[in-house]
A protein has these predicted regions:
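Cysteine endopeptidase catalytic domains of the caspase/legumain-like
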Residues: 1-125
Length: 125
């Protein structure tokens, strides 16, 4: 379903392919992608909601993302790792505040918007 009135003219890209024979055999191919292709936006929580943090360890989302990246970076693509992180934040974290019990047991879920058109893996060092 439509989400607006605008048309995406896209962006023109060029890819050069070098032949092993000589530099004169180089082939340049041209192709077009949507303007917003290959964007990934990750927010610690959904629009309008509080993003929780531990005073000693930092935000739930960033701490979880670091742990997930550390554990899965060699075998798993980034979008899958963000999904793992979102599940962990949503299910394993709850707020606690000994000064203000009204904000205890509150939850959070990260918001991931992907316009990726390919899987993104991190290469080994």
């Amino acid at each position: 379903a439509c989400r607006g009135e605008e048309f995406d003219n896209g962006i023109q890209l060029r890819r050069g392919i070098t032949s092993s024979r000589s530099e004169t055999d180089n082939v340049v191919t041209s192709y077009k992608l949507p303007t917003y292709a290959d964007f990934l936006i990750a927010h610690s929580t959904v629009q309008g909601f509080y993003s929780w943090r531990n005073p000693e360890e930092g935000t739930w989302f960033v701490q979880c993302l670091c742990d997930v990246l550390d554990e899965y970076h060699e075998t798993t693509d980034l979008l899958k790792m963000l999904t793992i992180c979102a599940r962990k934040v949503a299910t394993q974290y709850s707020s606690y505040n000994d000064v203000n019990p009204e904000i205890n047991d509150k939850k959070q879920v990260p918001s991931i918007t992907s316009m990726l058109i390919r899987d993104l893996y991190f290469s080994p060092k």
